[in-house]
Amino acid sequence: MHTLAAVVVLQVCWAAVLWPCPPTHSSPVDCREEQAGSSQCPTISQEKLLDRVIQHTELIYRVSEESCSMFEDMFVPFPVRLQRNQAGNTCITKDFPIPTSKNELQQISDTWLLHSVLMLVQSWIEPLVYLQTTLDRYDDVPDVLLNKTKWMSEKLISLEQGVVVLIRKMLDGAILNSSYNEYSAVQLDVQPEVLESILRDYNVLCCFKKDAHKIETILKLLKCRQIDKYNCALY
């Protein structure tokens, strides 16, 4: 009962975070005070929760694209961009045991799809926090870019909570007892030279954008399976 109660509370809190503006109609999770202790208190369905997680991820990916492009235009000369593209994958998540092709993704279970999403989300929480501290040292970084990185960092934590609830619901109250923050390879104890810092921050933004898109793809595949499992082979 304690586990179920914790899940319900997390569902309610996470659903509230997803609404950036006060809703004009009653909340989908409407537990009145007199109902709070009742087993009949409604909770958000797995299907609706998955939809919100996907919407959340779409927004994060869109803002990551905008942030990466803005940083690139302001601080990264074209030859440096080209050099990075030729260097290949230098992202902190490159060695994660996550399928990279659609054919590989088709072979893994729904639970492992969510587990892969959680792995990616947790690995980026600390790097995005650190990115904010490094951008604060720039003399001419616009407030809009700072606000975008702060927004992504906050929403990533919200996304983590939503994915945890989804996994619990799919595993009937259980949760995979793992944390992947240890994969974060950000060095917090050194202050690099200006160019090195720019290149590192650029790499962080580009890699996060790439992984945000991967998270979105995995979640949409999961959604497709929920609707019609046998027609997602070409997703």
Swiss-Prot record:
Main location: secreted
PTM comment, free text: A smaller variant of SL is probably not glycosylated.
Gene3D superfamilies (UniProt xref): 1.20.1250.10
Tissue expression profile of the protein: Pituitary gland.
GO BP terms: animal organ development; growth hormone receptor signaling pathway; positive regulation of growth; positive regulation of receptor signaling pathway via JAK-STAT; response to nutrient levels
Gene Ontology molecular function terms on file: growth hormone activity; growth hormone receptor binding
Keyword Glycoprotein: yes
Keywords: Disulfide bond, Glycoprotein, Hormone, Secreted, Signal
Paired cysteines (S-S): 31-41, 91-207, 224-232
Sites where a glycan is attached: 147
GO cellular component term, pick one: extracellular space
Signal peptide location: 1-26
Highest rank taxon of the organism: Eukaryota
Record localization: Secreted
A Pfam entry, by short name: Hormone_1
Family, similarity comment: Belongs to the somatotropin/prolactin family.
Protein name as catalogued: Somatolactin
